[in-house]
Amino acid sequence: MQNDAGEFVDLYVPRKCSASNRIIGAKDHASIQINIAEVDKVTGRFNSQYKTYAICGAIRRMGESDDSILRLAKNDCIVSKNF
């Protein structure tokens, strides 16, 4: 779709579940999006960067959201591998 200036705009951009790679539909009201802050290892302060994870409602219904977020954080080196 184009606006009056000729730029392409989308009304809805679907998200994908970070754990299962499923598309999160517009009517999935059980889905969540969480930002986890990256912390400087020396000072322990927030360094203005974060990782965004989206979890679909199906993963939350199964009770697997905490394990999924922990697995994703380990893969992104936010949490240590031996946690």
Swiss-Prot record:
It is found in: Cytoplasm, Cytosol; Cytoplasm; Rough endoplasmic reticulum. Keywords: Cytoplasm, Endoplasmic reticulum, Ribonucleoprotein, Ribosomal protein. InterPro entries: Ribosomal_eS21, Ribosomal_eS21_CS, Ribosomal_eS21_sf. The keyword Ribonucleoprotein applies. GO terms for cellular component: cytosolic small ribosomal subunit; rough endoplasmic reticulum. It comes from the Eukaryota. One of its GO terms (biological process) is cytoplasmic translation. One of its GO terms (molecular function) is structural constituent of ribosome. Signal peptide: none annotated. Transmembrane segments: none annotated. Gene3D superfamilies: 3.30.1230.20. Component of the 40S small ribosomal subunit. Belongs to the eukaryotic ribosomal protein eS21 family. Component of the small ribosomal subunit. The ribosome is a large ribonucleoprotein complex responsible for the synthesis of proteins in the cell. This is Small ribosomal subunit protein eS21. It comes from Xenopus tropicalis. The gene is rps21.
